[in-house]
Amino acid sequence: MIEWGCGDGNQLSLAEYPQYTGLDVSPCVIEKVKKQFANDRSKMFYEVGEFLENPSSAELGLSLDVMYHLVNDEIFESYMRNLFTYAQKFVIIYSSNKDQPHTQHVRHRQFSSWVQKNAVEWKFKTMIPNAYPYDENKPNETSFCDFYVYEKK
């Protein structure tokens, strides 16, 4: 699997994958997770640019809590193309899926319309609702995201 936006490894430390490639735009983050998982040969980490110089693909492309941080249209477009291009069978996205401005560093997008228009070889499989839907009275205990699963046709 390839995770686009692996972050600091907190979520990864809770999961077990037979093979894992984690990508991020932050050199500091990549350095941290390389050290954190140095003894685990099933995990590899790259800066996105480094990965794209010699890309590979995997059965699953994964995007967790990244999409709504992509406030720039060009970066969003590139991210989505990469997410779907380098996935062989499945893409799983954990994100909001509505067009709505939020703050300077958050932009909710209806990414499903992008997939429908630009990744026609992929079909929507299912949406798994978040067990803790967003509650403005409990913003640190809830989330505005759900899981969206796509399968290659």
Which residues does each PLM region occupy?
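Class I (Rossmann-like) S-adenosyl-L-methionine-dependent methyltransferase catalytic domain
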Residues: 1-56, 73-153
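Polar, enzyme-active/binding microenvironments
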Residues: 59
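A conserved beta-strand element that flanks and buttresses the S-adenosyl-L-methionine
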Residues: 62
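Short catalytic micro-motifs in class I SAM-dependent methyltransferases
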Residues: 65-69
